[in-house]
């Protein structure tokens, strides 16, 4: 094979001497070795490129609360399938989600308020969850709490959905000043767990704290349910990886309490 290779390139590649135990490259052989190493690298890169071409991309965006409390177990379930899919996850505001979908930077997205008004996009409910009242484990709130009995000075406000804010203004007034304003339930860990502290939280987020750090009650006059919407490009079918992800999401949501699924 070596002689055939030398005949093909038209020059000796090895120095041959009787009794020599080690092979020595000629000057042409040294150059050929360098070329061969480059060819090997190119071949490896070509194989890697072919592998990448076989992997699909699934690009998903969601608002902060959805990405923090709802989707992480679904991401885990989807990745455990070991599909030839690279998953891209983005946390975006509704307005940024709209632009990213229209520019084909996303396959689909989830928003938590129906504020998208564009004929090029389709918005449909994905699931619905009620708001529950969370308080310290040793609090004495009844199983059903009248909002009129709550002290807004003991509240941690974490929800900024327009419908929730209208409910809040109706019960506590537009000038109400809660104890703490935040965008995550984790901020509750900064507060001393005094008996009267409370927060209105979506059911799925509340479930992560039941028993461990909070007691859960219902409202006699609750805020409007929190609805998550699936946003896609109008008239464009979802890819097989996207459909499989939604299937995993549906399975996860059906196992949750207090959640109505529309997928």
Regions found by a protein language model. Name each.
Residues 93-97, 102-105, 112, 163-217:
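Hydrophobic hinge/microswitch elements
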Residues 141, 145-175, 238-246, 256:
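Secondary-structure junction motif
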Residues 6-25:
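A short LG(V/I)-centered, amphipathic sequence patch enriched
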Residues 57-61, 109, 156, 199, ...:
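Short, well-ordered beta-strand segments
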Residues 55-117:
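Central regulatory/effector-binding core of bacterial HTH transcription factors
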Residues 8-9, 32-53:
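Alpha-helical linker/hinge and terminal dimerization helices associated
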Residues 166, 203-215, 221-263:
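C-terminal effector-binding regulatory domain of bacterial HTH transcription factors
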Residues 122-135, 148-152, 219-227:
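Short Pro/Gly-enriched coil loops immediately N-terminal to beta-strands
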């Amino acid at each position: 094979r070596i002689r055939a290779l030398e005949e093909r390139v038209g020059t000796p590649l090895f120095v041959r001497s009787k009794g020599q135990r080690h092979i020595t490259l000629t000057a042409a052989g040294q150059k050929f070795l360098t070329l061969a190493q480059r060819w090997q690298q190119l071949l490896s890169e070509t194989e890697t490129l072919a592998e990448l071409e076989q992997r699909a991309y699934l690009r998903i965006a969601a608002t902060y609360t959805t990405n923090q409390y709802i989707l992480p177990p679904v991401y885990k379930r989807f990745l455990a399938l070991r599909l030839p899919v690279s998953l891209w996850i983005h946390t975006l505001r509704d307005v940024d989600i709209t632009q990213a979908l229209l520019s084909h930077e996303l396959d689909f997205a989830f928003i938590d308020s129906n504020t998208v008004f564009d004929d090029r996009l389709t918005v449909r409910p994905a699931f619905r969850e009620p708001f529950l009242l969370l308080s310290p484990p040793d609090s004495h709130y009844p199983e059903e709490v009248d909002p009129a009995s709550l002290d807004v000075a003991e509240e941690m406000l974490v929800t900024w959905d327009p419908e929730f804010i209208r409910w809040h203004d109706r019960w506590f007034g537009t000038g109400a000043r809660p104890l703490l304003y935040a965008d995550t339930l984790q901020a509750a860990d900064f507060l001393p767990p005094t008996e009267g502290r409370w927060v209105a939280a979506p059911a799925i987020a509340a479930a992560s704290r039941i028993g461990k750090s909070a007691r859960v009650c219902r409202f006699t006059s609750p805020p409007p349910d929190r609805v998550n919407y699936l946003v896609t490009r109008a008239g464009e079918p979802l890819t097989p990886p996207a459909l499989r992800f939604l299937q995993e999401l549906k399975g996860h949501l059906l196992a949750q309490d207090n959640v109505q699924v529309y997928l």
